[in-house]
Structures are given as C-alpha cells and as structure tokens.
Amino acid sequence: MSFPLIFERSRKGRRGLKLVKAVPKAEDLIPKEHLREVPPRLPEVDELTLVRHYTGLSRRQVGVDTTFYPLGSCTMKYNPKLHEEAARLFADLHPYQDPRTAQGALRLMWELGEYLKALTGMDAITLEPAAGAHGELTGILIIRAYHEDRGEGRTRRVVLVPDSAHGSNPATASMAGYQVREIPSGPEGEVDLEALKRELGPHVAALMLTNPNTLGLFERRILEISRLCKEAGVQLYYDGANLNAIMGWARPGDMGFDVVHLNLHKTFTVPHGGGGPGSGPVGVKAHLAPYLPVPLVERGEEGFYLDFDRPKSIGRVRSFYGNFLALVRAWAYIRTLGLEGLKKAAALAVLNARYLKELLKEKGYRVPYDGPSMHEFVAQPPQGFRALDLAKGLLELGFHPPTVYFPLIVKEALMVEPTETEAKETLEAFAEAMGALLKKPKEWLENAPYSTPVRRLDELRANRSPKLTYFDE
C-alpha cells in the first residue's frame, strides 16, 4: 500500500493548534525586507493526522535500533539511550550567551578534547567540524596553510591517496585545490611501498591514509610509510573512519601521523544517518597547531574561555562551536566506558568481524584479501551472484545489507562491519541468511525485496532526474 506524503494529507484550513496573536504584531518588529511576500506553502493537517503520519513513517524505517546493520566503514554500533538524557541537560544553552555563564559546557568541550588527544596522540584539537568529510577538508586546509606559511604552497600541489581510500579523500583534496594521485594496493591489500616511493617528492603536500584500511587490514608498514613521508616533507593525514578497531590500543600520533580527523558519530556513539548531525574533530601535531580553526576552548586562571587570538588560523569552518550535543554524547560515551572499556569495545569489534568472516567463508563467500581482519572485511559472492541482488535479498530477510561495490578494487564487494555491540547469535543468524540467499532461485534474487514498503527503485532515473520538491515549479 502506498504511503501518502504529508502534503497529500493536507486540507485547506485544518489546524493542529491555534497561535495566540502577538502584541505588538510580530511583523511590526521585523524589517519589511525580511518579511515574506506570500505565506509559506506548509501542509495543513490536524494533530492526529500529523502524529499518525510520522509514527507510520517511523515504523517503515530500518535502523540499528530495529535490526542488524553491518554497513561497512560506517560503524553502525548501538547508541546508548543514556546519552540522550545527557544531551537534554544542555537543551537551554544558547551559543550567543556569555561564555562565563556556560562554564559547564566549555568544560565538557575542553575535557572531550583532552580525551581525544590522549586517544589519538595529537597535541591540539578543534571540535568545530560538523562531519567526517568536513573534518577532512579542515585537516587538508590546515596542511595547505602550513605549506604556504613555509613558502612551499606553490610547489606542493599534489595529495596522494590509496586506491582503496574513501571517495571523500580525493574529493576533499580536489576541493582544497590539490591534484590527486592514486597509490595502488599491493597483493596483500596494503599500500604498495615501491609505488609510494616513486610518487613522493617536493611536489607532494600530503598522503591520506585510513588505518586499518577499507579492506579491514592494518597497514603493517605504517612506520616505514611515515618515515618516507617525513624525509620528503610530506604531511601524513589520518582518516579516522576506522578508529573503532584500534581505540585504546594504538594511536595515530605514535604511528607518525600529523593530522587526524575523527568521526564521533561512528566511533563514539553519536547517532548518525539521514544527514546528521555529525561531528568530525581534527587533531594535529604541535607544528600544525597554529593553523587550527578559531575559536579553541582553553582553560585559564579564571575558568574556560574561547580563544580567538590565533593569527595563523585558517579561520572559522562552522558557525558557533561545532555540533555541541554530538560532543555531549561522545563525552558521555568516553566517561561511561573509560580507557579499559574503550579497549574492550575495540577488541570485541575485531573479534566479531573475524568470527563473521569465517562464518561467511563457510557459507561459500570469498574474501579476496584474507589477512588478519580488524573491525571489518570485504567479501565476494560466488561466481554468478551480484552484490546488489544479495543486498536486496537481505532486506527481504529482515537484515540491513552491508556496503556494496566498495572499495572499488574488489569486484562485487560486500563490505561488512558488525561492530562490537552485536551478540554472537545475531552474527550467526546473519550468516545463515547470507547462506540462504545463495540457495534462492536467480529470479527470486533479481526481483527482491518483496515485502518492504518500497521495492526496487529506478536508481539511474533518481540520479539523473531527481525530483527534490513536492511542487512542480
């Protein structure tokens, strides 16, 4: 049965509440140039219709609270509801209020920064970026400012990325004005060291790496990679997408990374999906600290304050001070678990991934880069099966599918990340479902799913001819 849009439920004149007339009228207080000439085209519905509409939509959603969600490279772990209670405690704060009246909030931000520096081995940090890709761009702009300050901005115009990198890495470098060159992976799925040596030189600004990489493998030669970058004057950038595998056990700063961005909405249990809000703090080594965005939260003799006096800063990268309530949730997560708890979470994430990998291999799936997996792995179906069909079939069986067709270096890739919060029984049930799909008739797979609210979309048409508004014009 089709589900009507909220605009299709609208009936002229229906209201869910009656607004009290303002005295004086609001329009008398607002400059005329800021007033609408015509009323906004909002749906007109009563309260019950509104409640039923959004309750109905919520029952059609799939999320980590409803089913197993092994979306590779996304760390869809459970988000404790206690953190929502903590976030509500700060609901009445306003970013324009005097910092002297928001000492608790500033203290939380400062403490979170200290925790993240300790976990990553960085010397300074900004909490301002609002997402992972936003953090990436901030980090690369910091590197650009550093090279420009040294008089090398015009010569170092290249950023290196592995062929297994997240797509946001080359996009970020390009947005920052750099040329992007790809470094191939070796036969074991790690960076090809000889290829890297050929590319390094005085023309290179940075190398962007994820460790563990997107194949779920730890870059075992990371110290050698770091040494080569240092000798060439190249800044080593850490994409924190996969920090969940090593938090508390290993620190990017100790591996030689100069910049790191984190995804609080992945590693530190801030709910994500649907466009945010996210949080992508950026940590740097001391030589890059002068270029961090303003303001930074600092602690002085009279309490905590916002430091804008940073002449070499790249400036603001977001209004106000980041997605603050995301920071509250991450702070609560770290304070709840402590260092030993974080280490256990990382260890369980790795254990779950390795166990599930072996289960899928028993069901007939291949793992082309079958080294010691960390928090995730990339599998392939047997010959003749399409990753897309298997993903759609999983929806019919009640599971969210893994990431498909990424990384690009694996054909028909199924990128699986179970996270630490899933039980052994859940992993086994998922493996059984994956095995059952291989026994389904080809026609069944090609037409799945059957019982979801929306079946197969015309994805090509949706990309080429998107309809982004309900209204025709």
Curated annotation (Swiss-Prot):
E.C. numbers: 1.4.4.2
Summary of the function given for this chain in its UniProt record: The glycine cleavage system catalyzes the degradation of glycine. The P protein binds the alpha-amino group of glycine through its pyridoxal phosphate cofactor; CO(2) is released and the remaining methylamine moiety is then transferred to the lipoamide cofactor of the H protein.
Organism for this UniProt entry: Thermus thermophilus (strain ATCC BAA-163 / DSM 7039 / HB27)
MF-aspect GO terms: glycine binding; glycine dehydrogenase (decarboxylating) activity; pyridoxal phosphate binding
Family: Belongs to the GcvP family. C-terminal subunit subfamily.
Protein's name in the database: Probable glycine dehydrogenase (decarboxylating) subunit 2
Assembly behavior: The glycine cleavage system is composed of four proteins: P, T, L and H. In this organism, the P 'protein' is a heterodimer of two subunits.
CDD domains: GDC-P
Reactions mediated catalytically: N(6)-[(R)-lipoyl]-L-lysyl-[glycine-cleavage complex H protein] + glycine + H(+) = N(6)-[(R)-S(8)-aminomethyldihydrolipoyl]-L-lysyl-[glycine-cleavage complex H protein] + CO2
InterPro entries for the chain: GcvPB, GDC-P_C, GDC_P, PyrdxlP-dep_Trfase, PyrdxlP-dep_Trfase_major, PyrdxlP-dep_Trfase_small
Top EC category: oxidoreductase
Any single GO BP term: glycine decarboxylation via glycine cleavage system
HAMAP family: GcvPB (MF_00713)
Residues with PTM N6-(pyridoxal phosphate)lysine: 266
NCBIfam families attached to this UniProt entry: PRK04366.1
Signal peptide limits: none
PANTHER family: GLYCINE DEHYDROGENASE (DECARBOXYLATING), MITOCHONDRIAL, GLYCINE DEHYDROGENASE, DECARBOXYLATING
Entry GO terms, CC: cytosol; glycine cleavage complex
Keyword line: Oxidoreductase, Pyridoxal phosphate
Cofactor or coenzyme needed: pyridoxal 5'-phosphate
